[in-house]
Amino acid sequence: MIAQWYRWRNDAMMASMNVADRSHARVIRIQQAIREQPGLDGWLFYDFRHLDPIAYRVLLLDPSLHVTRRWYYWVPAQGTPVKLQHRIEPHVLDGLPGDARAYVSWRDQQAALGSLLHSAKRIAMQYSPMNAIPYLSRVDAGTIDLVRSLGAEVVTSADLVQQFEAVWDDAQLASHQVAAEGLRAIVDEAFGFVGTSLAARSSLT
């Protein structure tokens, strides 16, 4: 019963906030986290055929999305995020807030990315220096080379990722509190039963 209540309450809380609202709130949190990192201009998310599951979880994207082309999502410390997607798949990031741009060819992509990051000097990506954290190392070396060739310094997103992967959100905390209250009630009831049974000298089994 407690487990069912736990699941019901969590589902109800999440359902009360639509996808767009959740995505908008998440991006606000991401920008707050970026601003807490000294000298960081933004966080660049990148994926090709689901190579980066971290990006999908942090951005609250549907993991079942059909993705066959590269996409980028630039979240600056300040200002409006930007989506860069292939023209064949222009709706992959529809659930995320921000301006949308499209590319067709490799040259288009490179030029669009350069325009996107023209003022950014220090960028976080799912990259781990010396592959120290394999779990985090999701962006291929070629893409790192591409971003660096545009004049930006690429740094690890480890400190940012842990704020979303290793910390409860409000809904998870609320669900935990409901479960804790239920367990406390069960413990109190069990000890009450034991006390009553001992006082009456009746069997507990």
Language model features: what each stretch is:
Residues I2-D11, V27, D108-T205:
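Flexible, acidic/His-enriched mid-domain "rim/lid" segments that flank
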Residues I2-S115, E181, A185:
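N-terminal accessory/capping or targeting/presequence segment of soluble
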